[in-house]
Curated annotation (Swiss-Prot):
One Gene Ontology MF term: DNA-binding transcription factor activity
Regions recorded as binding DNA: 26-65
Task performed by this protein: Modulates transcription in response to changes in cellular NADH/NAD(+) redox state.
Name of protein: Redox-sensing transcriptional repressor Rex
Cellular location(s): Cytoplasm
Amino acid sequence: MATGRTHRPATRSRGIPEATVARLPLYLRALTALSERSVPTVSSEELAAAAGVNSAKLRKDFSYLGSYGTRGVGYDVEYLVYQISRELGLTQDWPVVIVGIGNLGAALANYGGFASRGFRVAALIDADPAMAGKPVAGIPVQHTDELEKIIDGNGVSIGVIATPAGAAQQVCDRLVAAGVTSILNFAPTVLTVPDGVDVRKVDLSIELQILAFHEQRKAGEEAAAEGAIPAAASKESADKGPDGDVPAVMPA
């Protein structure tokens, strides 16, 4: 089976925008769910709703893939699953190493969704000598001294960093020097990498802060709406006459 070193997705060479690439996994997840239910075709409106995007944007995204659907029928679900999987490079095996096997790293190692999406956890690596040899998700943890040999021996091009912030840059440098060209960073720090290396940062605390912002805004809108009700009632009361009736408008 081919490995991540032998092929890279064609999305860049075909000029597919990064925003479109970021939405392709959303479409693939929705399409996979439809495929599992043996749904043969899907309209752009139905798929857009399932993926949580605008249908016009979905049609534009699919035009980059050369998929325009059939009027009155929609899109072929199985073909789209294959087409998007191919664009994302998921029709081959991608060996991945996870560095930092604390609580987060162990949780990532135990995540079953990697294998079903074409990502094979080739190795788990940690700097703690006491962790060496201990199995996590059925994979023995290896010491960071073995990092370069592990990368080379497994043809790894994707690395996951789940270390403390203080160790992340050094780990990143070693991964890149060993040949890793794509990094998923869970450490709460910004990594510096050379040209040609892609980094995707996942910061759960930032995502929670964004949710807190939206919660605060919703609370403010609700408070403003509740304050508007008494104001409207006061105005209505002021408009009424001494007997509680609204005065008639006299003709000019």
